Amino acid sequence: TGQLRPSIGAVEVLGINAAISPQKLKANIGIVPESESPPSYLTPGEFLQFVGKLRGIEDLDSKVKYWMDWFGLQEKSDTMCKDLSKGQRQKVMLASAFIHEPKLLFLDEPFANLDPIYQRKCRQWLLDMVKNGGTIFLCSHVLEMAERMCNRMAIINNGKVLAAGTVKGLKESDDETLEDVFIRLVGHSIEEAERLSDEGVAEEE
């Protein structure tokens, strides 16, 4: 986030020093948090205008109109975000992450509450972004989507990376699904945790 300055060393993202040029870096990054919603008392257009001005987007009015149209939100242009459906609010959040066409995206359950049409539409936009040199960090429990979209992935449980690599590399056979991989790794981790917990109880007794 850039809120804490490093006591030593430097962090560069996209070749930009995060401490020296935080605004330049943020202009190249988009983010959709899992549980965030757009501000209640702004309309979708007002929120996108706000985000666009923060990022110094040129020709902002046309960009806002483009993404409002792209997400089918034209009829909601004068509606407060608090009065939108969950799916519509998610579209606004995605539009705020896409509007400046970033080189780096962080997405946490980005397709939550979206209907299948917009899931496919967004997925294709993201795949095109990667083809054009962009990078996406995607967090999701929808393993089928992750398998279709990601060329590398990490399986994390309780903050610990259990495995990382390509989808093919994580599988023990061609017949194994990503769900099978997850259950194999996380299930083993849970069983191990339960075993250690039981041993601890036994030792106390």
What is the role of each PLM region?
Residues 9-17, 24-25:
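Conserved ABC transporter NBD signature motif
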Residues 49, 53-76:
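Conserved ABC ATPase "signature" region
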Residues 164-165:
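ABC ATPase "signature
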Residues 80-84:
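Conserved ABC ATPase signature
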